[in-house]
Design a protein with these regions (language model features):
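Conserved CoA-thioester-binding segment of acyl-CoA-metabolizing enzymes
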Residues: 1-54, 91
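Glycine- (often His-adjacent) and acidic-residue-rich active-site loop
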Residues: 55-90, 108, 138, 221
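C-terminal long alpha-helix characteristic of the crotonase
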Residues: 123-128, 179-227, 234-235, 240, ...
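Terminal low-complexity tails and localization/encapsulation signals of metabolic enzymes
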Residues: 1-3, 247-260
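Well-ordered beta-strand positions
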Residues: 121, 160, 164-166, 172, ...
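CoA-thioester-processing core
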Residues: 89, 93-95, 103, 109-163, ...
Length: 260
């Protein structure tokens, strides 16, 4: 199926979603709604085991919200509904049952940075830049940045970035834990795909359990988080993949996981 704002390619159990809104891949309301529909399809598709989210071109992952739409936000109730819709979408990405890798090919600013923070893992080109510059427009991050950035890098560093509206380099993003890997720009697409392919070969049920335990558990007190882990572990232990994994270990062969 063809999409208006995104390109979707599936290969070797990996779905590559490309934000295709030149020149800077802004996230319009229509684009965000479309992204939700894409996630609907990919979640149901058993041939897809991991996802890559990236931007078209070589300069920008996403510059964030389409500021031209702000004037048509309407009253408080309408604006609150719009923000809630975005929060729900980004929460869905964060809780997606299959690994989601942000492949950051350039600038990730504002909502674009908040989008990549909602992904499970992130790999960036060495020329990429990150920022939440909303304060310079007299507003503030509203797509989850005030909540996810402190959880990823710590409160004081997050406040510094948001209060100053500063940009940071890919190398600094790596050093503070905002991304997992930084690679030369010309190798980004290949490295992201190989990483996603490696994850796609893993046990789907166990990976879903890990994601749920980490994301949901981190929002709870430790005893409740451990309860989430316990419930997921008990479910995973009963799968065919668990039996296969143990058998492969003792047979000294590579396991073949089926997601059952």
């Amino acid at each position: 199926m063809e999409w208006k704002h995104f390109l979707v390619e599936i290969r070797d159990q990996v779905a590559r979603i490309t934000i295709n809104r030149p020149p800077v891949n802004t996230l319009s309301r229509d684009a965000l709604i479309e992204l939700g529909s894409i996630l609907d399809q990919l979640e149901k598709d058993p041939s897809v085991r991991s996802l890559i989210l990236t931007g078209a071109g070589e300069k920008t992952f996403s510059a964030g919200a389409d500021v031209s739409e702000f004037g048509g936000m309407g009253d408080r109730e309408q604006a609150e509904g719009f923000l809630k819709q975005i929060h729900d979408l980004f929460d869905r990405i964060e809780n997606f049952p299959k690994p989601v890798i942000a492949s950051i090919n350039g600038k990730a600013l504002g909502g674009g940075n908040e989008l990549q923070m909602a992904c499970h893992l992130a790999i960036a080109a060495d020329h990429a830049e990150f920022g939440l510059p909303e304060v310079r427009l007299g507003i503030m991050p509203g797509y989850g940045g005030t909540q996810r950035l402190p959880r990823l890098i710590g409160q004081r560093r997050a406040l510094e970035i948001m209060l100053e509206g500063k940009r940071i380099s890919a190398q600094e993003a790596l050093e503070i834990g905002l991304v997992n890997k930084v690679v030369p720009a010309e190798r980004l697409a290949e490295e992201a795909f190989e990483w996603a392919k490696q994850l796609a070969e893993g046990p789907p049920v166990a990976m879903k359990g890990i994601i749920q335990s980490v994301i949901n558990g981190s929002r709870k007190e430790l005893p409740e988080g451990l309860k989430v882990e316990r419930e997921n572990m008990l479910a995973v232990m009963r799968t065919e993949d668990a039996i296969e994994g143990v058998a492969a270990f003792f047979s000294k062969r590579k396991p073949s996981f089926k997601g059952k």
